[in-house]
Amino acid sequence: MSYNNPYQLETPFEESYELDEGSSAIGAEGHDFVGFMNKISQINRDLDKYDHTINQVDSLHKRLLTEVNEEQASHLRHSLDNFVAQATDLQFKLKNEIKSAQRDGIHDTNKQAQAENSRQRFLKLIQDYRIVDSNYKEENKEQAKRQYMIIQPEATEDEVEAAISDVGGQQIFSQALLNANRRGEAKTALAEVQARHQELLKLEKSMAELTQLFNDMEELVIEQQENVDVIDKNVEDAQLDVEQGVGHTDKAVKSARKARKNKIRCWLIVFAIIVVVVVVVVVPAVVKTR
């Protein structure tokens, strides 16, 4: 799907590919990377589904804008609601999958690159979806205005805007119906405008959710960096503790050596005293005895 997206991101995403974890004899680290890449492949498949769902929503929007049969239009709206629900489910799933992939790759630059590619592609698809909704919203408003002008051709721009913005349009349209010359056509126009109004309410809700999702995915980068900073700080603290521990150990070794030297000196002094006693006391006594 191609849109004039001012926020389109140029980062290419990796094509998904399956890796057979069981057949790889590459050790624990290799198996970990294989498991991670299988997770990325699943994310890319879900991104493909999300892209397809957006295309379906866009196609149904265009068909609804040109459909004149009310029964067929009702069927199309039901299909549209189903695809919008599918898109919402995929958005929630992809957000969690990409967040998990970023956590798994926090220590590995290759994993980080793969997770970031998925995040960038998701952001682009969110923007594409916002453009689809925005275009449909504008077309809906224009059609609602044209329908209102059928029964109130002399209405001002403000009056038209108030009519299509009114919840249900009952109060304004009741007066318009009283003044209309062609009641049947006016009632048809009222039903059409009310249907458009409900579409506009859904679109506003969808666009608000997409904006919040886009902001959440942008903030994942900040959150990821904060996690890296915390880990780096913990590593630095651990290194400092090790260095301090080594310093304390060196001091202990020096103290032990000094204690041993003092102990040796004490024994030497004791030995010297014993020698002196022997020479001064014992030797003369032995000489006298002889």
Curated annotation (Swiss-Prot):
It is found in: Membrane. CDD domains: SNARE_Sso1, SynN. The chain crosses the membrane at residues 266-287. InterPro entries: SNARE (IPR010989), Syntaxin (IPR045242), Syntaxin/epimorphin_CS (IPR006012), Syntaxin_N (IPR006011), T_SNARE_dom (IPR000727). One of its GO terms (molecular function) is phosphatidylinositol-3,4-bisphosphate binding. It comes from the Eukaryota. Residues 1-265 are cytoplasmic. The keyword GTP-binding does not apply. SUPFAM superfamilies: t-snare proteins. The keyword Membrane applies. Keywords: Coiled coil, Membrane, Transmembrane, Transmembrane helix. GO terms for biological process: ascospore formation; ascospore-type prospore assembly; exocytosis; Golgi to plasma membrane transport; Golgi vesicle fusion to target membrane; intracellular protein transport; SNARE complex assembly; sporulation. Residues 190-252 form the t-SNARE coiled-coil homology domain. It is a single-pass type IV membrane protein. Residues 288-290 are extracellular. One of its GO terms (cellular component) is fungal-type vacuole membrane. Required for vesicle fusion with the plasma membrane. Present with 450 molecules/cell in log phase SD medium. Belongs to the syntaxin family. This is Protein SSO1. It comes from Saccharomyces cerevisiae (strain ATCC 204508 / S288c). The lineage of its organism: Eukaryota, Fungi, Dikarya, Ascomycota, Saccharomycotina.
